[in-house]
Amino acid sequence: LSSVKEMIDSTPKSKIGMLCNLGDFLHWDGLEQLTPSGKNLLEGDSRYSRIVDIAMTVMDEAVRMMLKKYEKVVFVCAEGNHDIAGSIWLRKFIRKLYANEPRLEVIDNDFPYYAYRHGETMLCFHHGHKAKMGSLPKVFASEPRFREDWGQSKIAYIHSGHYHHERLLEDAGAITEQHPTLASRDSYATRLGLMSQRGAKVITYDATDGEVARITVRPKT
């Protein structure tokens, strides 16, 4: 939560704050420490019930911190390939917990692509496990549920994760960004020699001009 607090403290006092979990918030998805689709063995050192409890506590506290600063908070909890089921119950948990909080909007759908239009700026999100980075503008532009927002936007910003290292691509009317992770390497990544700098981005968007500022937060531990 220290990184979340640092991110919130570093932002201007905007009317709207968006909390985006790009997926894989939970490393595994049930009582067995396996990826849900590929059944690949994952490294873990605790009971799933404890992981669930920590996930709920951290996300709840992050939402509470944001509600203290912003007039409205938008919450995105994207499906990841490691937490297909976990992303569902975490999203539902926050929606139910804050059912009487009109200042919180939870983007609650099972479709693993998510979007929010801020004036003429469209913000799009997908973990990156179903569509490659270069094809994401086509997915969001052609998907019927997003077509109207895409047409009414001057620019679209698409955010993905999955690969844990940074990339930026501007093409087809969109800027697509692949984000790093706050998580440290597990033994799988370490043994394969996979390295990337940990971090999270805090991006400020204007309703007309799109991105106007950004800050990178690096975890201290």
Functional labels for PLM-detected ranges:
Residues 67, 94-110, 119-220:
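Conserved beta-sheet core of the metallophosphoesterase superfamily
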